[in-house]
Amino acid sequence: MDWKKIETSLDNTHYLYEGRRLFGKNFIEVLNFHTPGIAAVLDASGGYHIDASGTPLYAHRYCRVFGYYCSRAAVVDNDGAWYHIDEHGTRSYEQGYAWVGNYQEALCPVRLAGGGYKHIDINGTYIYPEVYRYCGDFKDGVSSVRLSSGLYRHITRDGSYLHPYAYESLGVYHKRYAIAQDLEGWMHIDKSGKPIYTQRYLRIEPFYNGMAFVVRLDGVQQVIDERGECVCVL
């Protein structure tokens, strides 16, 4: 059986393979299978991970578990502590957190018990000394973080700033450009942190094959190209 073809039911209570129910049981919740063929499930005994045959990977049960990314899975222990485990069910580091994300590019955002966010590496080590009000996933070596001032900046994998500009809100880069908001509205910026056009929008989306959906300040919906020129009005 090819685990990549295993699907979750629409109500997320069981698994299907080529339209047939797997493992002969319903769960409270099932999540998708991830490499190398492991899925997170929740039943009356608690949260745990199973392989493609439906066999639990370990005996311990958690309050909740999530999928594997970079060979690490986020779990919530019964005392409320969040941390990561490896594919054998072994805890990856000693520290517990108020929340942990999923590893992306071998780095992960975490929320400290006393408040604030940081990034940890695959061994649970902080990658910089700063504590931020918020931080997100790394994508292509860059993450968006919220400073104590409330503004957002882009940082690289070593914690240094990618460019000198701060914004009211800031997304990660997608195909060379990121969405950003200043006091005038939303725009797209390049890797230097500068806007790629002069106009501002009420709402925008990342570029998709050279085009992006935007809502003008007057409410008109458009599609623009990477020069900021209107391709069509919707």
PLM features: residue spans?
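Residue-level detector of conserved, function-critical positions
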Residues: 1-234
